[in-house]
């Protein structure tokens, strides 16, 4: 009944107008699973490879016809007829078929599209929501949203060097209330920026991208918006940063072009520690560059006891890199992006290793997204307690929040909002 009878890949557009892969998997009993693959702007050097066509005469070289051909050809030939409930086996077959360490031949975008669509088809066949199918009966924790309301770095055309300034409504009683708090702060921030003469255009992830001179200026605007919206910073709502430090790490130092400053590793650690001391910041992602392991260790020793330090480019959702981080006590949390590793099985293994080792996990979108809301279900399935899926604008972002609202409603009295517990000692 759950045998795979057809797989159809196609090229669709993501939220940036670039092509991406969408896959339909049809089972013998008529169940159809559909998944669309996201794409990142600031990508880690150690990520699985997203296969692009490179034909400059079509979509400026960003077409994904080769990946789609792999889905409809080689991949279907290899897994057609297999049982969709055998997720680990199906993912292993595709990884072996690819034959490279980073999925470069068939493309992580091809493999992931099939992997997620298989899980969705199996869930439908079992008449279960995806979060329940993947996570079992204990999947009932709604994550704290990390809402990216000011954008900088590679996500915006402004001088701010850090990529994201986030609010976390961890003090809310439910996910729905937390979302409302975030929306109210977002609109209050918009008015504050406008009144101060800044533009209120939004970046790739729906956050504002004002021309502010420094991280402190952005944090001050966010703090004011939290207070003006009627909430208490450091009690109701907390702050988070994604420095995306790899993007401005050159020749062994951190070059803040927007501020016109260069900070060596010691100065970078000192600066981040100072920000944590001055603001209610409970989480910093990629505060150091992806291969600056010594810097990461220094940062962890300096503020790891009082701040969540999330490895994105550092760990790239990869079990081996996370294993090294755990061994060296580097960072204390991992950002989980399904397309960084390229299959559902490997994603779940990474989250499991993190949780087993006392590291937190944050389910995450990419800057190039679609209307696909799979990561909302995966956040609940893995009970990871935190989700990062952009701002309170753009339907490619709100699609995930809306799915979490549905899940919370469906779970009813069983639903549990992670709240401050997700941040342990930090909040």
From Swiss-Prot:
Pathway: Carbohydrate degradation; glycolysis; pyruvate from D-glyceraldehyde 3-phosphate: step 4/5
Record-listed (2R)-2-phosphoglycerate binding positions: 163, 337, 366-367, 388
Record carries keyword Magnesium: yes
TM ranges: none
Keywords: Cytoplasm, Glycolysis, Lyase, Magnesium, Metal-binding, Secreted
Cofactor: record remark: Binds a second Mg(2+) ion via substrate during catalysis.
Record flagged with keyword Secreted: yes
Names of required cofactors: Mg(2+)
A GO molecular-function annotation: phosphopyruvate hydratase activity
The reaction(s) this protein catalyses: (2R)-2-phosphoglycerate = phosphoenolpyruvate + H2O
EC numbers, comma separated: 4.2.1.11
GO biological process: glycolytic process
Binding site for Mg(2+): 242, 285, 312
Domain of life: Bacteria
Location in or out of the cell: Cytoplasm; Secreted; Cell surface
Active-site annotation: 205, 337
Similarity remark: Belongs to the enolase family.
Entry function: Catalyzes the reversible conversion of 2-phosphoglycerate (2-PG) into phosphoenolpyruvate (PEP). It is essential for the degradation of carbohydrates via glycolysis.
Protein name (Swiss-Prot/TrEMBL): Enolase
Species of the source: Azorhizobium caulinodans (strain ATCC 43989 / DSM 5975 / JCM 20966 / LMG 6465 / NBRC 14845 / NCIMB 13405 / ORS 571)
């Amino acid at each position: 009944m759950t045998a795979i009878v057809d797989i159809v890949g196609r090229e669709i557009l993501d939220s940036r107008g670039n092509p991406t892969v969408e896959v339909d998997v049809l089972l013998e009993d008529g169940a159809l699973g559909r998944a669309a693959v996201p794409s990142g702007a600031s990508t880690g050097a150690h990520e699985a490879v997203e296969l692009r066509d490179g034909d400059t005469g079509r979509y400026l070289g960003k077409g994904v016809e080769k990946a789609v051909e792999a889905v409809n050809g080689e991949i279907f030939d290899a897994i057609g007829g297999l049982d969709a409930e055998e997720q680990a086996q199906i993912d292993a077959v595709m990884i072996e078929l690819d034959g490279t360490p980073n999925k470069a031949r068939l493309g992580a975008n091809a493999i992931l599209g099939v992997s997620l669509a298989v899980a969705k088809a199996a869930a439908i066949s079992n008449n279960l929501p995806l979060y329940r199918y993947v996570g079992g009966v204990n999947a009932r924790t709604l994550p704290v949203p990390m809402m990216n309301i000011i954008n900088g770095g590679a996500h915006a055309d402004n001088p701010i060097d850090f990529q994201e300034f986030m609010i976390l409504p961890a003090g809310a009683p439910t996910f729905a209330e937390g979302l409302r708090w975030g929306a109210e702060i977002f609109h209050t921030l918009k008015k504050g920026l406008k009144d101060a003469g800044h533009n209120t255009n939004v970046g790739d992830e729906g956050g504002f991208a004002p021309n502010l001179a420094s991280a402190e200026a952005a944090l001050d605007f966010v703090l004011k918006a939290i207070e003006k919206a009627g909430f208490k910073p450091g009690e109701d709502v907390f702050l988070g940063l994604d420095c995306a430090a790899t993007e401005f790490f050159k020749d062994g130092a951190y070059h803040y072009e927007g501020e016109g400053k260069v900070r060596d590793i010691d100065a970078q650690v000192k600066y981040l520690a100072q920000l944590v001391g001055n603001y209610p910041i409970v989480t910093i992602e990629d505060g150091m560059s992806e291969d600056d392991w010594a810097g990461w260790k220094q940062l962890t020793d300096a503020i790891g006891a009082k701040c969540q330090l999330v490895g994105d480019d550092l760990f790239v959702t990869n079990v081996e890199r996370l294993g090294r981080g755990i061994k060296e006590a580097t960072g204390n949390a991992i950002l989980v992006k399904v397309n960084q590793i390229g299959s559902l099985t490997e994603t779940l293994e990474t989250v499991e290793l993190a949780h087993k080792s006392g590291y937190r996990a944050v389910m995450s979108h990419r800057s190039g997204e679609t209307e696909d809301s799979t990561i909302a279900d995966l956040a609940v399935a893995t009970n990871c307690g935190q989700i990062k899926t952009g701002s309170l604008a753009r339907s490619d972002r709100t699609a995930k929040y809306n799915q979490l609202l549905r899940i919370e409603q469906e779970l009813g009295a069983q639903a549990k909002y992670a709240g401050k517990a997700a941040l342990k000692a930090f909040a």
